[in-house]
Curated annotation (Swiss-Prot):
Belongs to the Fmt family. GO terms for molecular function: methionyl-tRNA formyltransferase activity. NCBIfam families: fmt. (6S)-5,6,7,8-tetrahydrofolate binds at S113, L114, L115, P116. Gene3D superfamilies: Formyl transferase, C-terminal domain, Formyl transferase, N-terminal domain. InterPro entries: Fmt (IPR005794), Formyl_trans_C (IPR005793), Formyl_trans_C_sf (IPR037022), Formyl_transf_N (IPR002376), Formyl_transf_N_sf (IPR036477), Formyl_transferase-like_C_sf (IPR011034), GART_AS (IPR001555), Met-tRNA-FMT_C (IPR044135). Its EC number is 2.1.2.9. It is an enzyme of class 2 (transferase). It catalyses: L-methionyl-tRNA(fMet) + (6R)-10-formyltetrahydrofolate = N-formyl-L-methionyl-tRNA(fMet) + (6S)-5,6,7,8-tetrahydrofolate + H(+). This is Methionyl-tRNA formyltransferase. It comes from Photorhabdus laumondii subsp. laumondii (strain DSM 15139 / CIP 105565 / TT01). Keywords: Protein biosynthesis, Transferase. GO terms for cellular component: cytosol.
Amino acid sequence: MSDSLRIVFAGTPDFAARHLEALLMSQHEVVGVLTRPDKPAGRGKKLTPSPVKVLAEERNITVFQPATLRSEENQQWVLKQQPDVLIVVAYGLILPKVVLNIPELGCLNVHGSLLPRWRGAAPIQRSLWAGDTETGVTIMQMDIGLDTGDMLYKARCPITPEDTSASLYEKLANIGPDALLKTLSLITSGKSQPETQNENLVTYAEKLSKEEARINWELSATHLERCIRAFNPWPMSFFEMEGQPIKVWKAEAIEEQTSVEPGTVLKADKEGIYIATADGILNITQLQPAGKKAMSAANLLNSKREWFTPGNKIN
């Protein structure tokens, strides 16, 4: 097999663009790019191209932006590119079986977890939410299931107690491209050894919702602190004061028991706002009132100390 593969790349956000960049700098030939249609963005709701489209057009690569790949006409576009392999990174559209079967080497996916743990839509966030100490990327052969295909390569990285979804996303965006290129080298040299996923180890990374981000004081402080990091930068953990959402950017869990009702303010000072939970105390150190920028707890107390009088109950 030739060392240089004809690749159709399918991806949309910056995470995907990092992988496309690595392919463009390699010996392989990217013959076409699939990405989601331009979307309204910003206050002016101006139609904005995806980071993948911007990069592809800078490099004069053919870009196709179908709303679906279920139509025969759109499938013909993929066929006409005559790819050896189709590489999917955070694309956002389902690839029907007929598309999966077009390239001789099938379709590869870069997935943001160590499969079979965290199949599904939000693997980066769920690894933080669950308190995992390690994650990574898996390069897998795609089939018609949801992240069920054989695994070809894994790259690992530790999760630190300071990591948020934003920082973990950045870590995986840094290790994923190299893992992808190594996988392609294994394939072209005939050394690839696909590994079947162990169904007994499967967990699912459900999509995040804004409602899930509402802080539930009936949970433990440790779990709430993990949620705050997992939901940063979206959808952002929050509670309400006077009907206004207050986003929480940073907090720490204190393993100290208290007999007061969960959601009760214990104290508030320049070190933070201490709130009772079902198990332990959550000290909130950085928050963002509606319509304001993120600020330290000390800054918010300068203007809204009455909100956090000890004994007050927070929704």
